[in-house]
Amino acid sequence: MIFVIGLGNPGKEYQYTRHNIGFIVIEKIANQYNLSFSTKKKFNCEIVESSVEKQKLIFIKPTTYMNLSGKSVISVKTYYNICSEKIFVIHDDIDLETGRIKFKTGGGNGGHNGLKSIDRVIGNNYNRIRIGVGRPQNNQDVADYVLNNFPRSEYEIVIQSIDKITNNFDLILENKLEEFKNKIG
């Protein structure tokens, strides 16, 4: 079983913000497999459950807002008895330049409130797909920065990153994590 969490905030006003890149990517991956999300209130998320290439697959988008993402993650993890090594969190990262992608297992949260919330309930030994959104300029507040939409000048770079993850997602299903890391990095 593979459990993939796209981090973001619910609501149209956040749909295309830097902080919602996790939602954007997970939706694109789900579309690739012709899968649709449905709301599960007991898990505080939108969820997709399916089998792809003989692999049970669960995608979620927490509906709790970023700072409480762990609430959804622990609910689904517990219900399906998923081990942390099979969890993949897709999220924005201000410490990476816009469009840069990094894959890692375990580690710190880099000040990311969604990851902090997840770490509190399941620890930090899970996989992360980090997507760079760049750092704010001119002393702009980080929270304001990540809650802004990507500027048009960054669209092409962001789309290429989303496509790179989506086009190589099958490698995760095949448990070829090192190859996935090399292809997206």
Swiss-Prot record:
Lineage top rank: taxon: Bacteria
InterPro entries per the UniProt record, alphabetical: Pept_tRNA_hydro, Pept_tRNA_hydro_CS, Pept_tRNA_hydro_sf
A Pfam family: Pept_tRNA_hydro
UniProt catalytic activity: an N-acyl-L-alpha-aminoacyl-tRNA + H2O = an N-acyl-L-amino acid + a tRNA + H(+)
Matches recorded under Gene3D superfamilies: Peptidyl-tRNA hydrolase
Any GO molecular function: peptidyl-tRNA hydrolase activity
EC number: 3.1.1.29
Chief place where the protein resides: cytoplasm
Residues annotated as site: Stabilizes the basic form of H active site to accept a proton: 92
Residues with site note (Discriminates between blocked and unblocked aminoacyl-tRNA): 9
Annotated localization: Cytoplasm
Binding annotation for tRNA: 14, 65, 67, 113
Keywords: Cytoplasm, Hydrolase, RNA-binding, tRNA-binding
GO cellular component: cytoplasm
Active site as annotated: 19
Entry's Gene Ontology BP terms: protein quality control for misfolded or incompletely synthesized proteins; rescue of stalled ribosome
Function: Hydrolyzes ribosome-free peptidyl-tRNAs (with 1 or more amino acids incorporated), which drop off the ribosome during protein synthesis, or as a result of ribosome stalling. Catalyzes the release of premature peptidyl moieties from peptidyl-tRNA molecules trapped in stalled 50S ribosomal subunits, and thus maintains levels of free tRNAs and 50S ribosomes.
PANTHER family to which the protein is assigned, alphabetical: PEPTIDYL-TRNA HYDROLASE
The protein's assembly and partners: Monomer.
Family of the protein in this entry: Belongs to the PTH family.
HAMAP family: Pept_tRNA_hydro_bact
Protein name, as recorded: Peptidyl-tRNA hydrolase
